[in-house]
Every structure is written in C-alpha cells, then in structure tokens.
Design a protein with these regions (language model features):
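Short loop/turn segments that connect beta-strands within beta-propeller blades
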Residues: 13-17, 55-59, 99-103, 141-145, ...
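WD40 beta-propeller blade core
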Residues: 9-10, 50-53, 96-97, 106, ...
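Asp-box/WD-like beta-propeller blade repeats and closely related beta-sheet repeat scaffolds
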Residues: 6-39
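Blade-level signature of beta-propeller repeat domains, shared across WD40, Kelch, NHL, RCC1
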Residues: 158-188
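Beta-rich, blade/repeat-based domains predominating
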Residues: 26-44, 68-86, 90-93, 112-126, ...
Length: 188
C-alpha cells in the first residue's frame, strides 16, 4: 500500500512490475503508511497536529496516537519495530521512538543525521536512517546508540530522502531529492 500525499491510498502488487489492485478513498492528508497483520498505520497531518492512525483494513480506526513535535511539521518518515511494539519516526534532525501507545521512549540526535528523512529497520531492529543535509545513511540500535555512518557523500549520496531495505538480498535502495534514480547498495 502507498499513499499519494492526498486523499487516496493505493493498494499495489509488487513483482517485476507494480500493479495497482485498488484505490481506497480517505479523508485528510496521509503522508506515510505501514502495514502489519491486518492493520495499517497511517501518518496524518492536518496542518496543526501530526497523528499516527491505526486502522483495521482501512475500515475502522482502532487508535489515534498524537505525535510529539506535532507543531513543527509532519514526520518525514516512519517504520515499525519488528515486534510491532515501537514506532520510529524522523522529524527535523531527530529520530524518535514511541511505544505503540504513543509514549515517547527516546530521541536520538547526531551531527551525522542532519535533515533526518527516510527510515527503515532490519529484522534485528537495527535502524537505517537518511540524513538529507548531512548526506549520510546511519545505523542506530533500538536503544538509540549510533553504530556508525553506513553511507555518505563519499559513496555518491546526494540529499538522500528515502530508504528501503531488502533483507532477502541484503540490498539497500535509496532515493534522493531532485533525482529520479534509485541507488542500490549491497550490504556485505
């Protein structure tokens, strides 16, 4: 499922090509989406309040989770921990961890994470986070300890904003601002 930043959520099938299966109309602007079990978590921002909305198959709202720093902007990206007990999101220069009820567990900041954007997590809970302005991808433990800079401008990054980890092939896909290319890096 993907959001278009508008009033629809597109359900797509991913194989060698993307195939749109159906569209779901929603009310309000949604900026991100995650899926677990039969539930969607949506990042909704109405210009005043940023909220994570948990919805059962997009039919019924199960829970609304107010997001810290909601007065600044919508979160740039978010993902769920592998055990689905935590929500990780980026906002400004921060990586924030909430429990599934919205309680803030930790906030991570680093000079290596300026303009925090895209975020993903591996099956061990290690977070991979893009710093658009620092031109980096860093690794952070679930406890909020930085493991290091994985990729930087020395590796050809320029304003990384989106990241996806394919654990089956040990590949990281990165999108960059003002580029229509997807960069692929293999983890060794």
């Amino acid at each position: 499922a993907v959001t278009t930043g508008g009033l629809r959520i597109e359900i797509v099938s991913v194989s060698s090509i993307l195939t749109k299966l159906r569209s779901i109309s929603v009310y309000g602007d949604y900026y991100g989406i995650a899926f677990y079990d039969t539930n969607f978590i949506l990042d909704k921002y109405d210009g005043k309040q940023n909220t994570f909305v948990i919805s059962n198959e997009l039919k019924k709202v199960i829970k609304r989770i107010p997001v810290p720093y909601h007065d600044r902007c919508p979160s740039d990206a978010f993902c769920l921990s592998p055990d689905v007990h935590s929500i990780y999101f980026t906002v400004e220069d921060r990586l924030v961890t909430l429990d599934i009820n919205g309680k803030e567990l930790s906030t991570f900041e680093s000079d290596d994470l300026e303009g925090a954007c895209g975020i993903t997590v591996d099956k061990n809970g290690i977070l991979y986070c893009c710093g658009e302005n620092s031109q980096t991808v860093i690794q952070v433990t679930p406890a909020g300890r930085q493991l290091g800079v994985l990729l930087s401008s020395d590796d050809g990054l320029k304003n990384p904003i989106g990241i996806c980890l394919n654990t089956k092939n040990n590949v990281i896909l990165i999108t960059e601002r003002e580029s229509d290319e997807v960069k692929m890096f293999r983890l060794i």
